[in-house]
A protein has these predicted regions:
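Thiol-/selenol-based redox modules, centered on thioredoxin-like
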Residues: 127, 132-177
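Thiol-based oxidoreductase modules, predominantly thioredoxin-like and allied folds used
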Residues: 51, 75-94, 108-119
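Amphipathic alpha-helical repeat scaffolds
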Residues: 31, 51-55
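N-terminal "domain-start" segment that seeds a small globular fold
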Residues: 4-40, 124
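Conserved helix-turn-beta segment immediately C-terminal to the redox Cys motif
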Residues: 45-46, 55, 59-84, 101-105
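Short, internal strand/loop/helix patches
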Residues: 95-144
Length: 177
């Protein structure tokens, strides 16, 4: 009987933990072109948020991100968020960033205005992505450019991946296959 009670309590805790996940609020954010992101365009899709930079050792990941987007765009939207907080590796303005991404990598996924992903000016989206008290799943800290956060079609955080994780890694693509 004690074993049964112990198992029942374990399942109850797991169930409670699963129900803590909160849906991502629809934060207001502008694209590089200055228009507000319309979240309804992405209903039913996975969202991959990536803090990006043009002068980083991980910048070639734009190519993999574009390939990921082209392969899975029916079920995935990639949102690149330029950030200049790591080594000042994204100093450009909106026009320069857009031009760099298009000319060098053919980027056609969504790019936003430049934001802060940590610190006192942390953008609210990144507060939600990185704080278990906000997302109900886990806490993390953004370590460098090209850290990735995957949100499910239900708008709940699935996981995050450090910069060293290739965009085409099975860790990420297994969710869409």
């Amino acid at each position: 009987m004690k074993l049964f009670d112990s198992l029942a309590n374990t399942f109850k805790k797991v169930e409670q933990g699963m129900s803590r996940a909160t849906e991502m609020p629809l934060f207001e954010i502008q694209t590089l072109q200055g228009s507000k992101i319309e979240w309804s365009k992405f209903d039913g899709k996975y969202l991959l948020f990536v803090n990006v930079a043009s002068a980083c050792g991980f910048t070639p990941q734009y190519k993999g991100l574009q390939k990921l987007y082209e392969t899975y765009q029916e079920q995935l939207e990639i949102i690149g968020l330029p950030c200049n907080q790591f080594g000042a590796q994204e100093p450009g303005n909106a026009e320069e960033i857009a031009s760099f991404c298009e000319l060098n990598f053919g980027v056609s996924f969504t790019l936003t205005e430049k934001i802060s992903v940590k610190g006192v000016n942390q953008y609210p989206l990144y507060k939600w992505l990185t704080d278990v008290n906000e997302n109900g799943i886990k806490s993390s800290s953004v370590k460098w450019n090209f850290q990735k956060y995957l949100v499910g079609p239900d708008r709940k955080l699935i996981d995050y991946y450090y910069s060293t994780t290739d965009p085409l890694s099975k860790k990420i693509t297994r969710h869409f296959e």
